[in-house]
Amino acid sequence: MENVSKKSFSMLTDRPGKALLLFAFPLILGNLFQQFYNIMDSVVVGKFVSENALASVGASYAVTNVFIAVAIGGGMGSSVIISQFLGAGRLTKMKTAVSTTLISFLVISAALGAFGLAFNDRILSLMNVPDNIFADAALYLRIYFWGLPFLFMYNVQASVFNSLGDSRTPLKLLIFSSLLNIVLDLLFVIEFHMAVRGVAVATLIAQGLSAALSFLILMRKLRGYRQDEEDFRFYDREMAASMTRVALPSILQQSIVQLGILLVQSVVNTFGSSVIAGYSAGTRIESISIVPMLAIGNAMSTFTAQNMGAGNQKRVKEGYRVCYFALAGFAVVLCVLTQLFGSLFISAFLDAEASAEA
């Protein structure tokens, strides 16, 4: 119990700069693995199937990102409430918040998955997906919607771990899931010749196992926190409403950006599969580039919530200054790297001729 408390409350006792950067580092690695996890589908189909296969996965990517944004935004919002209870030492309330979060997002993800399955083809039609890649794009997206609860539960549980001051467990799970996804991608595509279906099924299996392991580890971790005088509840409606108020701005922030990208993707789709493939490769590189900024922002969110819960407003201001300069430094470095080595990065997804077009 002592070890659990130490790790959980490091955000309250360590120097703000040290606490934030040490907490953010596993988040950066974890987010990189998350992007690597997603990118492998594109790399495998682009290199071992065809340009059209890459285009079909890329055309679906903008849609999947909207749902990922909802999961991440919701998890970030809920983690604020969890961190506040943890910072205030109200551990039973913290457990109730975790349980309420998991139940809420399991129901939401199932509903969104059902919606996606019902309107799968209609969504792609509205996005102007070309006929020559429509069938594969619809297949990839359909399998993705079946696995939506797995994706939601992993991302939300990762946010819960972060809110508890544990950014290492999500990283370990992502490494496991990413490696499994790569092996299954190559197995299903190269050995079983399943093409687009293969990478979609591989992703579903890897996400499912990752979500299940995450749940088991989280339950074990929560048992390490002592019970206090407050009553535990599996689901608290008032707390769910409070979480919704906090999470909604985060969900909207994440989703509006992705909806904008979705509209751009709809325009790109009118130019044919070659342009879609090039654009898909470019957006994957962009996703990697913004990882450090997102991770530091998430670290600051957890840092702020825990310290506000404990009444340490001065530490929050100090942490903000550290984040500001760290983000500015990352932005300059990443801008230079993408400008200098953009063509090299694109070649990871496409052959030489297609890379030149991209």
Give the location of each predicted region.
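Helix-terminus/linker motif at the lipid-water interface of multi-pass membrane proteins
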Residues: 32, 36-54, 124-131, 187-194, ...
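Membrane-interface helix-loop junctions in multi-pass transport and translocation proteins
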Residues: 178-212, 342-344, 348
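Short runs within selected transmembrane alpha-helices of multi-pass transporters and secretion channels
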Residues: 75, 144-162, 170-178, 199-214, ...
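Signature of the first transmembrane helix
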Residues: 18-79, 83, 248-268
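Short membrane-interface helical motifs at transmembrane helix boundaries
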Residues: 111-138, 142, 333-356
